């Protein structure tokens, strides 16, 4: 299942190579800091055990990796993967004291790992940016161990008309904020458009099931502004 907007040549990589050094700041501004609680909810839902391996795909600057290591122990390991070289470099420097986090430049559709390597797979605000949802989910299933769990935290469809009205109007301001902070509004015009075009909660559940995940479920956060999906490789 290809995504038309994301298949525009070099669009997504150019977006994140432009904003990497202001990525954390913009996340805080755009969500009023709420993205931190969404990510903590993901880790809480995961309830990770010690000495396990996580792959964090479309890792950004490594927020999920840091939360995972802090919630487990020093023998847990995280492989952070992102298609943006600049984002990987920035995240690696940001978390340089975390010796059990490794970093690779790669895309969700083609992960540089052998089959059945990880206990947990996370993609946080990244599935929407992939060129091909089907390939991304197939790769997620491939690299998970049997009994491993998949998590996707992503912008979704709001289930309240009033909240949706407020959000749609607020989203019009995001490119202006991006221009003020980053000096370029185009990456944030892409952000807003990609959110509008992304599939809804039930469609993602159906796609997960198509690619062999079982016990698939989701919870809406903040009225569906964001949804947390999960499934198992059994």
Q: Model-found features: residue ranges?
A:
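Conserved alpha-helix/loop element of class I SAM-dependent methyltransferases that forms part
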Residues: 32-52, 67
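C-terminal alpha-helical "lid/dimerization" subdomain adjacent to the S-adenosyl-L-methionine
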Residues: 10-11, 81, 153-207, 211, ...
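Class I SAM-dependent methyltransferase SAM/SAH-binding core
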Residues: 53-110
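A short acidic, Gly/Pro-enriched loop at the edge of an enzyme's catalytic core
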Residues: 109-121
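A short glycine-rich, Lys/Arg-flanked "PGG" loop and its adjoining helix->strand segment in the class I
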Residues: 134-149
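Hydrophobic beta-strand segment of the Class I
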Residues: 23, 121-122
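N-terminal, positively charged/glycine-rich alpha-helical extensions of SAM-dependent methyltransferases
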Residues: 1-24, 170, 181
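Core SAM-dependent methyltransferase catalytic element
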Residues: 205, 211-234
């Amino acid at each position: 299942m290809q995504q038309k907007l994301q298949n525009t040549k070099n669009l997504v990589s150019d977006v994140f190579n432009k904003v990497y050094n202001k990525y954390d700041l913009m996340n805080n501004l755009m969500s009023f800091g709420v993205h931190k609680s969404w990510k903590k909810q993901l880790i809480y839902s995961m309830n990770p055990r010690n000495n396990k391996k996580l792959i964090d795909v479309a890792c950004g600057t490594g927020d999920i990796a840091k939360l995972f290591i802090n919630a487990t122990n020093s023998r847990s390991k995280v492989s952070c993967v992102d298609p943006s070289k600049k984002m990987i470099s920035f995240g690696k420097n940001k978390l340089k004291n975390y010796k059990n986090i490794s970093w690779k430049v790669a895309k969700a559709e083609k992960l540089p790992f052998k089959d059945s390597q990880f206990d947990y797979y996370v993609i946080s605000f990244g599935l929407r940016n992939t060129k091909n949802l089907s390939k991304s989910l197939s790769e997620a299933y491939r690299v998970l161990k049997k009994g491993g769990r998949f998590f996707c935290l992503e912008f979704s469809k709001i289930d309240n008309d009033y909240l949706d009205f407020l959000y749609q109007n607020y989203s019009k301001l995001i490119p202006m904020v991006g221009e003020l902070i980053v000096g370029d509004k185009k990456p944030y015009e892409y952000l807003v458009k990609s959110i509008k075009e992304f599939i809804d909660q039930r469609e993602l559940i159906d796609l997960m099931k198509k690619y062999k995940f079982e016990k698939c479920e989701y919870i809406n956060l903040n009225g569906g502004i964001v949804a947390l999906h999960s499934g198992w490789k059994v």
